[in-house]
Structure formats: structure tokens, C-alpha cells
Amino acid sequence: MKKSLLKSKLKQIFLKHKLSKNHAEICSNYLIKAEILEAKGHGLARLKMYCDRIKAKVINPKPKIKIKKISSSISYINADNSIGFVGADIGIKQAIKNAKKTGIGLVAIKKSGHYGLSSFYAEQAVNNKLMVFCFTNAPAALAPHGAKKSLFGTNPI
């Protein structure tokens, strides 16, 4: 399937699930990018999960995202249970803005969901000639050595 047709179909799906045009565009772009990078677990394979979470009201399709400036370098974002791509996209843009102004851009995001590959956001900072450290939390999936109960997520931190 051609990229333009796939993007059009994805946008239609997200719009049907009540995302704004801008948010549908953001989500479609990141899903396609994951497929191009052959990160299948973060691409189209996740589409049903996102749609199911919207239907279950776990993801808010019309979030009222709030950015709070803590200082010139630090911002805090309440993503209002947005789809993760949207909260993270706003977050990296804010971090870049802060870093260009002060040399450091630190952004914490709460009430967001699965956001795909961290590299999506890190690449934007690198393209702006900035160093970046981008990470997220993850549910307990791995047990410490010798333990029976999962404690660690599969994220690097």
C-alpha cells in the first residue's frame, strides 16, 4: 500500500474515533514511521489497541492538554489521558523550545499513554543539534534475579 493511501486511511480511523485533525495527523505519521523503521510492535500492530482504549475511555480523544512552566528550562505537561503520541509530541517540542532558550529543556508528562518509539522524539531534538535523553515508564514485566514476581518494566530506566 502506498504511504499516502495508508496515511489517509489511518487519519480516517483516528477521526472516526473522535481525534482532532491535528492529533490524527500526528498519530498517523508516527505509526507509519514505525512501519518504515520496521518496528512492527510500535506500528500498525498497535492500531487496534489505541482504538480499543479510546472506546474504553482509557484514552481521551479530545484532551485539554496543559503546559505549566516551572522555570525557563523546565515544563510540566498534563496530557489529560491523550494518546501517547500527542502528549510526547507536545513534550518534545516544549523541551526543544526550552533548550534553545536556556541550554537545557526538561519536560515531565503525566496522564499520557503508549507513545511508540522514544527515537521518534529523540530524533527531533538531535535534528535541532541538541542532546536528548528520552524515556518513559512501563508496567512490571520482568522479575529481578531469583524473584517470582515481576517488578521491572521493559524500558531502559
Task: Walk through the language-model features, giving the residues of each.
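Glycine-rich anion/phosphate-binding loop at the beta-strand->alpha-helix junction
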Residues: S28, L106-I157
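Solvent-exposed alpha-helices and their adjacent loops that cap or buttress functional pockets
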Residues: I67-I70, A99-K101, V126, K149-G153
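N-terminal and secondary-structure boundary signal
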Residues: L15-K18, I36-K40
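Alpha/propeptide regions of enzymes that mature by internal proteolysis
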Residues: I32, F85-V86, I92-K110
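Generic N-terminal amphipathic, Lys/Arg-enriched alpha-helix
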Residues: K2-H17
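Short, well-structured alpha-helical segments
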Residues: K21-I32
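Active-site cofactor/substrate anionic-group-binding motifs, chiefly glycine-
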Residues: A45-I96
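Aromatic/hydrophobic pocket-lining residues that form π-stacking "cages" and hydrophobic walls in ligand
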Residues: L10, A95, Y121
